[in-house]
Amino acid sequence: MNHQEVADRVLNAIGKNNIQAAAHCATRLRLVIKDESKIDQQALDDDADVKGTFETNGQYQIIIGPGDVDKVYDALIVKTGLKEVTPDDIKAVAAAGQNKNPLMDFLKVLSDIFIPIVPALVAGGLLMALNNVLTAEHLFMAKSVVEVYPGLKGIAEMINAMASAPFTFLPILLGFSATKRFGGNPYLGATMGMIMVLPSLVNGYSVATTMAAGKMVYWNVFGLHVAQAGYQGQVLPVLGVAFILATLEKFFHKHIKGAFDFTFTPMFAIVITGFLTFTIVGPVLRTVSDALTNGLVGLYNSTGWIGMGIFGLLYSAIVITGLHQTFPAIETQLLANVAKTGGSFIFPVASMANIGQGAATLAIFFATKSQKQKALTSSAGVSALLGITEPAIFGVNLKMKFPFVFAAIASGIASAFLGLFHVLSVAMGPASVIGFISIASKSIPAFMLSAVISFVVAFIPTFIYAKRTLGDDRDQVKSPAPTSTVINVNDEIISAPVTGASESLKQVNDQVFSAEIMGKGAAIVPSSDQVVAPADGVITVTYDSHHAYGIKTTAGAEILIHLGLDTVNLNGEHFTTNVQKGDTVHQGDLLGTFDIAALKAANYDPTVMLIVTNTANYANVERLKVTNVQAGEQLVALTAPAASSVAATTV
């Protein structure tokens, strides 16, 4: 690679004066761009030395690769006259450049609160769906499964009990998560949640009927009649209570010192919050919550299939804005009161939108002749059909525009069909082709037919339009000039550099590593702080941040060991190293250490990636079928190509 020329091509594509700040990590240039609309994305996509680009958190990242990215960066700095900065510095520059949006901040808060408890709600929801399958009549036969096989009655009742728990005790889950997000003690938040669902209180689901019947029980507090009402299945009151609790706790921590703080702050916070919960905050927010729920149900009932069609048409656009982050809170409220609401109309529509986007992306896969595009659309399309739409929407459909439009139209038509048959979900789950498991049993056939409509209506016009407009879009890649260096690799077994749980690179929460753009290999969730050499070789790359190592093995493999995700931002904190560039190492030699606990405490993912960066030189790179692995144990098998083809290959 000619690093000067690569830097020139990058600057030509981006604009020499269009870069506000630049840094690099082990594999990528990290840039803050003044105006991203001026970037010649096609030039970067066609550049053989650029392995990929993406934008995240205000940074435009260009994937170059270990051993080269630092040299390209140096050339870029010289050519632009920019000041060298660290990834941590550029993170601050990017954050400062992003306009604060109160609405997006609010959505982020909701997302932070609900995402941690979603697994519990999904588990309860799917168990509820299973119970529906066992107890619903006219699903498989005239009678229910339990009626035909009475021996299953006990199992169904047990499943129903387990399914009800996350929704009945929702205030405990929400109290913990919300109080933590608001900066308070989450265990005090859970305690307030327990107080709100005490068995001695009137059950939250029966409060309205109990009051209407004149049977509500009251406390007499300083002459006030305070209803002994529970808050089972409530969302908004718990969020309000958690905010007050966290605010009071921080106030008392500030004004009460020493041992008195430890003793009295929790008590004062709970007593005051509890009093406000049952006298003012709880009743008011319950009324608001009930009004919102009734309003949504009324809107659904009054607009019918037309409203569902419009919602389906706009759903993917809502995802782009981020407003969909409010939906978990709304759905939780609808599902927690399923006896009154009948279920949620949001989940079925989300499923139609995701299926439509996936179908449109797969249509591009079958229409394009570009191998690069095929690689992207195949994985993105399947992911969308399974409920993960970001790669399809942002990576393919929005860039090409017409697939997104056809997918939105398909979603609107399919959602209107859902509205005609009053299809509702009774559980949370994957909004995808397998979403039928969360649908009310009587509506499963209508849901499946709607899914087919969404797929077909999105796929066919996208495919036809793509065939007419894409033409011959085969990759036009400029091959880098060859050198006289002959590739010489041999079969080799690469050992694990750390102890931990082995997993596929595709499971890593990073779009570069998970897409195997840098090469194939393996990931390890570490349980030991020591990092050892995975094979005999020479250290080719080290970093001041000590978060990654490059090794050229004696058998020809080029290995990148990357410790954690985005850990370059730590500038070496929590890392030590025993080697430097040019050192000869033997398999098992200690390369360095990293503090796993400190990384987790700082909210960094400590997953270790072992990447074979010259994967293209091998016939096969395979992660061995292991789960837990000790440092030094076999992890990745490399198979060299036939000797004749190796000798003839140059780079």
Curated annotation (Swiss-Prot):
It is an enzyme of class 2 (transferase). Its EC number is 2.7.1.211. NCBIfam families: EIIB_glc, PTBA, PTS-II-BC-sucr. One of its GO terms (molecular function) is protein-phosphocysteine-trehalose phosphotransferase system transporter activity. The active site is at C25 (phosphocysteine intermediate), H562 (tele-phosphohistidine intermediate). Residues 121-481 form the PTS EIIC type-1 domain. Keywords: Cell membrane, Kinase, Membrane, Phosphotransferase system, Sugar transport, Transferase, Transmembrane, Transmembrane helix, Transport. This is PTS system sucrose-specific EIIBCA component. The keyword Hydrolase does not apply.
